[in-house]
Amino acid sequence: MEQTSTVAAIATPNAAGGIGIVRISGGDAIAVADKVFSAVSGKPLSEAAGYSAHFGTVSLDGKPIDEAIALVFRAPKSYTGEDTVEFSCHGGVYIVRQVLRAVLNAGAQPAGPGEFTKRAFLNGRIDLAKAESVMSLISAQGEQAASVAFNTIEGRLSGRIESVAHSIINVCAHLSAWVDYPDEDIEELSTDELEKTFSAAQSELESLISGFENGKAVTQGVDTVIVGRPNVGKSTLMNLLSGCERSIVTDVPGTTRDIVEQTVRVGENLLRLADTAGIRDTDNKIESIGVELAKKRLSRAELVIAVFDGAQKLTDEDMEIIDFCSGRRSLAVVNKSDLGFVCNTDYIKSRFGAYVELSAKTAQGGGELEKVLSDLLGTSNFDPSAAALTSERQRNCCVRALDSIKEARSALESGVTLDAVNVCADCAVDALLELTGERAGEAVVNEVFSQFCVGK
């Protein structure tokens, strides 16, 4: 995974703005920049100190195209750990692209997605967990999500993972020495000592995994489907949560046929929301297709919001939806509170773990919906200042480590040889160090950075 070329990319959004930034990184970054940049001081950037700024002009094919400020960073004290130059120029889309073109013509190669952060990882500036959180911070859509990502960048998650890993590594090293050098005077670890270490590691990993599940609604969003029979107010609720008219609302049953999707934020809860066709038996071919799509979409939902018309008695279609939600993470919304309730709300309450009454039309009850959602998703007790897992990859590493720790404890309890216990413990270490990147293969690293945008 060695990086030898000098790369460049636009580091700001592809839109007009106050400034645009073109970033260059690599062994020849300063030499490339000198080919296109002329400082008003008359001195080349090759003579510049690190952490210095220089005003001048950028030229393309010998013709000045913009004024810019060149920021020079010397290895290893840069974001990537390499020599880096950043041109801050005027933020017009055309101008920024021309500056990049000049840099590429001067010898730099186009940077791939996340390549600058990938180089920071490969050069030891950050670990893999911190690298992932850079993208999490960029994509954060709420205060808590941003706080979690920043705390991970600051190293809180890595600190917790490394603490667990090192405690197990110490055990593995001692067990290996005791097994491999029986003639040496190496004290055997007692079963109680091993159990204490493994138990503490298991508790910490279970806490991290639990925190991920509770914080998922904050950091990643929850795949959520709104379901109900026709004309109970599903689309009105979708529009209320979206803050705009995403779904068509009429008095005609069966208006919604396609699945309408929108990512919305309810308080600090991020929902990947889907409004589906009203579920009912129908002879309309197009509507029936929409109903089937709704049922398929429901099958993979992480959260179901079941909407009922409070102004009408429960129907067979309502009962079918109630039965479907049994055993699933679901929230009952009894809508049209502004019209007064006729339906059996006590029965609905008895069938759902979470329940709220509101008027999607007037937004009455919206605050209660936010509170109930937070309780249901576990975000009401979520502490964004604590170290937290921020990706499925990190969670999977912790789950694998936890499984190995449980196997080690089971082996210890059954009285097998300590070298067998050591094998299980070492598997846990492998999983934890894969999380931080110390033992991550090239395929894992490439997958992480493929999700980044170009320029970061």
Say what each PLM segment does.
Residues 54-74, 254-282, 298-303, 307:
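Switch I (G2) and immediately adjacent beta-strands of P-loop GTPase domains
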Residues 2-14, 143-265, 282-284, 313-456:
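C-terminal-of-GTPase-core extension/linker across diverse P-loop GTPases
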Residues 1-147, 151, 155, 331:
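A glycine-rich (often HGG/GG-containing) alpha/beta subdomain
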Residues 109, 270-272, 354:
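Conserved beta-strand segments of alpha/beta enzyme cores
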Residues 89-91, 241, 276, 308-311:
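Glycine-rich, N-terminal phosphate-binding loop of Rossmann-like dinucleotide-binding domains
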Residues 287-311:
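Inter-motif core of Ras-like GTPase G domains
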Residues 70, 110, 224-226, 249, ...:
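Generic preference for hydrophobic
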